[in-house]
Amino acid sequence: MLNNSSIKLKVCGITSSKSIQVAAQKKIKSLGFASNTLLGPNTCDDEMLKELIEECNEYKIEAVLLSRYQSTFELIKQIDYTKPKTIACSYFFDKSDFQTLKKLFKRLRIGISINPERFNLKYLKSISELVNVFYYDLNIYTKDNIKTFSANDCKDQILQLKNLKKPIYIGGGINPNNAKAVIRNTQPHG
C-alpha cells in the first residue's frame, strides 16, 4: 500500500479568491499563481497576482509566483510588486542573477521550473546552492498547445534532480488516474 501522507500538495493555476478559500478549507498549504508572462491557461496580471498573494498571506498559505520574465530587472519589479514567498523562475537566469535576487529579497525562496525538453543537469548543479526547490512540469506549453509527457518518460531526469538534495514538486498532466504511479515511480516532495 502506498502511503501518500508525506506528499505535500501544491495547487497551481489559481486565479480567484474563491479557489484560495477552498484551498484554506482543504488545508492546502501552498498555491501557485501563474503570471501572464507565461504561455498556457490560468494566468493573471500583476495586479491580480498581488491581490491573490495578499489573500494567501491572510490564510497563512505559501504563495508561489510562476514567472517567465527573461530579464532580472523585470523579475525584480514583479517580485517587489507582488511580494510572493516563493518564485518559480524559468531557465533564463545566470548564477549571478540568483545571487542578486538573494541579496535583494533575503526571505524569498527561489525555485526553478524544469520541463523534459529543457533539462540541463550541469546548469542545475551550478545553481543548486542558490535554489530552494525544483518544479518539474510534465507539460510543455506553447501559444496554442500543451504537450504532456508521462512521469515514466521523465523518471531518469527526476531521479537526477533528487541527487541535488532539494525538494522536487512534479506537476502538469497529473490526474487521479496517474497520481499514485507518479508518486511511486519518482517519490517527489510534492
Descriptions of predicted regions:
Residues 1-14:
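N-terminal amphipathic alpha-helix/helix-capping segment at the start of soluble metabolic enzymes
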Residues 22-28:
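A short, Lys/Arg-enriched amphipathic alpha-helix followed by its capping loop at the start of a domain
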Residues 17-21:
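Short N-terminal binding/cap micro-motifs at the start of the first secondary-structure element
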Residues 30-48:
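Glycine-rich, proline-tolerant flexible connector loops at the mouths of alpha/beta enzymes
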Residues 52:
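Aromatic/hydrophobic pocket-lining residues that form π-stacking "cages" and hydrophobic walls in ligand
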Residues 34-39, 55-178:
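Conserved anion-binding
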Residues 23, 87, 182:
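Conserved, mostly hydrophobic/aromatic
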Residues 12, 167-190:
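C-terminal active-site rim and adjoining tail of enzyme catalytic domains
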